[in-house]
């Protein structure tokens, strides 16, 4: 089995091989090392992320295990309550999602019946979901003629003597609960099909759910510590045996992982006497250090670990940053070299426990030298970033791309006197992130050549982006930027599926799309019905000048330490769907996707095998490389 997976990893550069590898990852976790000896845990949920960061064919497969788990996720974002919008039809009235739909109905009826309106104004009514309680209130106010009657009871001829009664159709809707529809016209009424939506767009547009980006960047911290966790191979899978810190202590324990972790946590608690938050800086820590500790994390130790955050029972927080995400793909030694510190080799992970125990003194010494180099490099990079990317501080972000892009946007806003806002609540954040599609859309599995946009920044820097707060609109306005909840119907003819959906058998579905993606989809032949949108009436001017200013400042700082990093950033910027500027990313990704589709329009669809927002896979047999393809680079 191990030999089979080692062979697959060495040839994992095509779709078919990667899919076979995924099948094994449903059963096993792969233990691998990079060329510098850093351990990497590969499982089914993180293989795509790893492939986006490095060439996995160059990894050394050490073993397989079922004794290691993936990252422990943060407590999930509460699911947005499913939403039904108000429908006011000549035959019926269906209130929007509410805890008290009967109250909404009586208030709606008061618009037509002045005596109900007068009673509501004079006496008010308590919230209730009980028909009998509402009828009791109506009777006490001399309004029994408007009593509420269930549709089924009315059809049984029980209430014909109340011609002015309020007839309601009652139902229970999954994930929402009891719902009622006021039937205005019995002769024409049929129970409607009501769209149950994942978001209430009008709620999401509320001002208090949005904050200006610049006000969210003013953060400070007290202490930064470099850290590395080292793991050895045992019969029960990998186990951590050493945790090194700089400046700080090194903890070694071959007999009890629990005591190793507890000693480390006690030390952390001791150094947090003057601050509530510290920053731990690792390298590729999200791929090995953190998931390995998560497996062995002791219960009732006073700390919880969620992804890259440690939270104590008294509210103290430790943020574990991965400096690799700020390196633009450099190895640890290259990263240290580029930021002016002396590159030092680190101890190899996933060695035999007996070897680690025998060489523990030299491993501790080697680890401390490597961590000192990492610490100095990160401090230098952070200092440079604070100057070049003000007011953005490295520790406030998870990746260089986020820091750089936020700095550019903020600089443009400062120069124009405008500002942009980001969601500060889980629900609008989830709505924005739902519009970001990073997936590869598979058309077919033919052997293909891979092309990538030469410069994503060139494409996105000349486009428009939202400024100020959004407004709610039922349907977006052509020519303005908006993000809409959409009911999408796929074309009946053969087409390239430009709108991603995870169920190929569904022809109609609800999803979140930007105005840019909507325009692209309509060109392909999709039918789009907008069910509510966030619309921005103001745009920021193009980013090109601000971008060029930022690039020039970085180049002018120090050609030795920054140019190579910047060139990699410009050539291969990556977006994600979780950032303070996710609103910017969602439109940037849409612009790139529109560009990719404009190229696909010039190619016979039979030659297209798959694509993403910045990559295109074209059949190896395709020879007609046209002018538009000159803006792509073959990988």
Curated annotation (Swiss-Prot):
- Where in the cell does this protein reside? Virion membrane; Host endosome
Q: Is Kinase one of the keywords? A: no
What inducers act on this gene?
Expressed in the early phase of the viral replicative cycle.
Q: Is this entry keyworded RNA-binding?
A: no
Q: What is its main location?
A: virion
Q: Which UniProt keywords apply?
A: Early protein, Host endosome, Host-virus interaction, Late protein, Membrane, Microtubular outwards viral transport, Viral release from host cell, Virion, Virulence
Q: Which InterPro entries match?
A: Poxvirus_F12L, RNaseH-like_sf
An annotated GO cellular component: virion membrane
Pfam families registered for this protein in UniProt: Pox_F12L
GO biological process terms, alphabetically, are: microtubule-dependent intracellular transport of viral material towards cell periphery
- The superkingdom listed in its UniProt entry is Viruses
What do we know about how this protein assembles, alone or with others? Interacts with protein OPG164. Interacts with protein OPG064.
Family membership: Belongs to the orthopoxvirus OPG056 family.
- Function field: Plays a role in intracellular enveloped virus (IEV) transport to the cell surface through microtubule transport. Together with protein OPG064, forms a complex that interacts with host KLC2 (kinesin light chain isoform 2) to engage the kinesin-1 complex and thereby promote IEV trafficking.
Q: What is this protein called?
A: Protein OPG056
Q: Which organism is it from?
A: Vaccinia virus (strain L-IVP) (VACV)
